[in-house]
A protein has these predicted regions:
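Eukaryotic scaffold repeat domains enriched in small/polar residues
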Residues: 1-243
Length: 243
C-alpha cells in the first residue's frame, strides 16, 4: 500500500525497502550474517515479506527458521511468532506470506501442506487444507479478495509422477474455499500452461496472473535423470479471458 518494494533476500539474510526508482530506504538484517539455525532470531534465509494496511511489516523466515517476524513501519522488531512443528501456529518451512485489507496474515506453511491464518498479533485463527506444498501466494488488495496459491509437485522419486498433486495454481476465496485450479492434472510439464515449480506470483489490474518458476533448480526433482532442455521457462503470463 505504500508503493515501495520490499525485497526479501534469502541468500543475504536481509529485507530491503526500496523506492520504485531504486533508492534504498532501509534494510533489516546484516548482509551475509545469518542468525543461528532455528534460533527464531532474524534472519536465517528469510523467504518473503508482507505489508499490512497499517504499514507494519511481516517477514516469513523459513529456510533456516520456522517463524514470522513483525516489524514497525520503520523496521523495528515488534515480535516473533511460530516454531517448528505441525500444530496450530507451528511451521514446517514457512515459505510465503501475504496480508489482506482487514489485516489478516496468510502464511504458506509449505511442508505442512497448508495455509495458516493469523491476526496482526500473531494469534492463530484458521488453516486451509487440501493443498500440496503451497509455495507462492498472491492476494489482490480490496475487500473479500481471492488468494492465488502456487503449489509444488511431489518431491520424491516414488511419487513425482503422481497426478492431481501439482505443480499447479489454486485460486481460493478468503475463507480458503476452492474456486478453481490451473494445471497439475498430469504432473509437471514445461509446455505453456504447464508448471514445473510455481515459486513467485503476482497479478495485474486486469486479472492476468504472472508465475515465476524455479524451473532449472526443480528439474531433477520432477524429471530425475532425464536430459534437461537447454531452455526452460521461468516466467509465464496467464491471461484472464472471462470476466
Amino acid at each position: 500500500p505504500d508503493d515501495n518494494l520490499y525485497c526479501t533476500d534469502d541468500g543475504d539474510h536481509t529485507v530491503k525497502k526500496i523506492t520504485p526508482e531504486g533508492k534504498l530506504l532501509f534494510q533489516i538484517g546484516v548482509p551475509g550474517n545469518p542468525s543461528e539455525f532455528m534460533s527464531n532470531l532474524p534472519f536465517h534465509r528469510c523467504t518473503h515479506t508482507a505489508l499490512c494496511p497499517d504499514n507494519n511489516i511481516f517477514v516469513s523466515d523459513g529456510y533456516g527458521n520456522a517463524c514470522v517476524h513483525k516489524y514497525s513501519p520503520d523496521g523495528k522488531l515488534i515480535k516473533t511468532f511460530g516454531e517448528p512443528g505441525s500444530g496450530p501456529g507451528q511451521f514446517n518451512l514457512v515459505h510465503n506470506i501475504v496480508a489482506d485489507d482487514d489485516g489478516w496474515i496468510y502464511v504458506a506453511d509449505r511442508e505442512n501442506h497448508r495455509i495458516q491464518v493469523f491476526n496482526t498479533e500473531g494469534k492463530y485463527e484458521a488453516q486451509w487444507n487440501n493443498l500440496h506444498r503451497p509455495c507462492g501466494l498472491f492476494m489482490p488488495r480490496g475487500k473479500c479478495p481471492v488468494c492465488i496459491i502456487g503449489e509444488l509437485g511431489p518431491g520424491m522419486l516414488v511419487n513425482r509422477q503422481y497426478k492431481n498433486l501439482g505443480p499447479r495454481l489454486s485460486i481460493v476465496d478468503n475463507k480458503g474455499e476452492l474456486i478453481t485450479r490451473l494445471g497439475g492434472e498430469d504432473g509437471p510439464g514445461h509446455r505453456p500452461g504447464q508448471f514445473l515449480a510455481p515459486h513467485g506470483l503476482s497479478a495485474d489490474s486486469l486479472g492476468n496472473i504472472y508465475v515465476g518458476e524455479v524451473s532449472y533448480t526443480n528439474w531433477p526433482a520432477s524429471f530425475g535423470d532425464d536430459v534437461k532442455p537447454k531452455f526452460l521457462k521461468t516466467l509465464q503470463k496467464l491471461e484472464r479471458i472471462i470476466n
